[in-house]
Amino acid sequence: MTLRQNKVAIRLGNFVFHGDDFGVIIKRDETIVGDVWTFMSLSSGDITMLREHQLTPYTRRKNGTVPAENMSDKQRRAIGLIEQNLQINWNGRTMEDVSTFIGLFKEASLMVTRKQRQRSYDQYAGLDGFD
């Protein structure tokens, strides 16, 4: 049996299908047998570890859905910051995907920003005008 190779690379943060189940990739582990992806189902919330050949990239939006290109500048900036802070990749196609992505990753992105700010302030801790 020949394994089907995905033409589109799967990356952390991507929406993907596992069979008929739609979800998001939340972790990648490099193992001696290849990459193992942690998949979170958006319908049930179940988390499953899968090999890449068990996943199908999300490449097209369903007919009748509003395209992600209609997102506001504020949403576009939020997605860009989330990608930058968490080192993940956006591949959504619809406005529902925009909402889901921001809802899933916004808090984690804000925590990264807070930690970075705190570290920059910590270097001044204990200093006074005479140090």
Describe these PLM feature segments:
Residues 1-12:
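Mixed-charge, Lys/Arg-rich low-complexity intrinsically disordered regions
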Residues 34-38:
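Short aromatic-glycine-enriched beta-strand elements
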Residues 41-66:
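Intrinsically disordered, low-complexity, charged/polar segments
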Residues 62-131:
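A charge-rich, low-complexity, intrinsically flexible signal that marks solvent-exposed coils, linkers
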Residues 21-30:
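Short beta-strand-centered aromatic/proline hotspots
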